[in-house]
Amino acid sequence: MRNDETIERRQAAARRSDVVVLTACPDYSEEHARAAVCNALEKWPGLSGIGPGVRVAVKVNLVTGASPKKAVTTHPQLVTELCRQLTMRGAEVTVGDSPGGLFTREALRRAYRESGMEPIEQTGAKLNDDIETENVTYPGAAAAHVFSCTSWLRKADVIINFAKLKSHGMMRLTASVKNLFGAVPGTTKPEYHMRFPNETAFANMLIDLNEALQPALNLVDAVVCMEGNGPTAGSPRPLGLVLSSENPYNLDMICAELTGMRPEDVPTIRCAASRGLGPSGLQEVEISGERPEQWKLTDFRQADGVRVTFTGNGVLGRLQEAIFRSAMQQMPKVHPSECIGCRKCFNVCPARAITMVKGKPKIDRKRCIRCFCCQEFCPRGAMKVHRTLLARLLQ
């Protein structure tokens, strides 16, 4: 990254608006999707900078090719309406992501087709087929100073980050901040899980990535979100909102509130607050539009897992926490009756902790780093997040 570009990004971060806009969107009909997207754009201070020749990269959640009905990916109708509004202003729009697995043109085309993204090109936008990568540096990093990044995002003048609100086995919540992990090429993602195996280190890496790329606008599709065994095998849960903000940390704070999660239980929110980048509580976030307390899902099913923190100081407090964390350690576990033996978990495991025995995966607990990649990419939801008896009792 050039020195002048680093300065520009820091200045942009200092200028970004902290307001989070909540827009009601009862379903994915063309009428409602267009109204919600238009409202979000009208409230965006950066819209005035979108005009003829401006290159806009729309980074969606396309973790895997899945039908929009499954609530795994950003819904194509919302993305279509966003692209339509941007191309009408003369912008050159490219939509894409780096799904898990091989980062090839064939894999991208398959993901676009299976997720219903292909009609987006009728708006004049294009679906990314650029598979080049490059290194991106972030001098102010807490975890990762250099990232391997997909080049198509770096070639844009403006990045719009369009996430999907879902529960997540490792990060508890995936929304704006977590969505940018798709800037890392699919086959490189396992390396980051190995380098940053615990939730705090991984969260700080995600924050570093957000600070390095500095999306101009963050949007979250929460019209229908995902609860339970997320981020790919959970259940669709209607909520009826589209959220937007220039500040990804404020936006994720509202997402946590809407799903009944405590900020301290979401690693990306907790770490952003500790670094002075994000809010420590809902009271610090300025909200425009709908009020979150009127939309909160009090019975939202989170991904299985319990986080316990001991506030005691010294060696004893740390020892207590270590013992309890070990006793409550959640881990992936396969349900053989649901497994089809596709070997997806075997192929994506960064720690090489999975072997195939009689056509079914077997996990080596000593090698498992509990990144839950196997659970995330299982096409049948056969890989579950398993909790110990103590964890279930505390839950």
Predicted regions and their residues:
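N-terminal and secondary-structure boundary signal
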Residues: 1-336, 340, 346-351, 355-360, ...
